[in-house]
Amino acid sequence: MKPLVIFDLDGTLVDTPSGIVSAFITALRDLSMPFEDRRAIRATIGLPLEKAFGQILALPVEDERVTAAVRQYQAVFREQVLPQAPGLVFPGVVEGLALLKGQGYTLAVATSKVFASAKALLEAAGLWSYFDLVLGADMVAHPKPHPEMGLLAMSRLGADAATTAMVGDTTHDLLMAKQAGMAAIGVTWGIHTTDQLKAAEPQVIVDTFSEVVGAAHALLKLSSSPVSYC
């Protein structure tokens, strides 16, 4: 059975958070619902868009204004952020994914984006070909931090929790991993602070993508690579 590493997308593989925040602001301004609190918007990254806009606008996710905001945001993201995607890939990601793939790992993405948006971003960033499976929030009944997405990835790819690790920059990612019984690797270059990540009790927190590779080896017992535990 091949070891499986599942990655979050925004803030883990691609440095999209600032673009996401700007797209939120532009979309709401376009709809005459101005909201300029960048910190509050940034805090919602990692949630499905409906929940994020519902939280920001203090509206139920079923409200038509939330639906309109999501639709407008997606249009703005396509126009403003996707063209920049090749330059937004975090340092070491391409090399690390290629190394893991070459060493026999199965690779997947589990994201709070809907599948079509995730596919568009991965393709624009030049990362699509590395992944055996991409799961979006619209492919499960319960998105992160619920374990369903992690369990579905393992089921589809024939993996088990003992040989699976989740890599992410938010507690949503790490809590999903914990509840699914798999190892969790937190990364410090994304949305949540190191203290926030520690609160989710991952097995390890790393500062560079090359350390992700070493942590995967160590946690999945494929080598004696050193790893610094929290």
Swiss-Prot record:
Query: Which PANTHER family does the entry mention?
Result: HYDROLASE-RELATED (PTHR43434:SF24), PHOSPHOGLYCOLATE PHOSPHATASE (PTHR43434)
Which Gene Ontology cellular component terms are annotated?
A: cytosol
Q: What is this protein called?
A: Probable phosphatase IndB
Q: Could you name the active-site residues?
A: D8 (nucleophile), D10 (proton donor)
Gene Ontology molecular-function annotations: metal ion binding; phosphoglycolate phosphatase activity
Q: Where does Mg(2+) bind?
A: D8, D10, D169
Ribonucleoprotein as UniProt keyword: no
Q: Which family does it belong to?
A: Belongs to the HAD-like hydrolase superfamily.
Its gene is indB
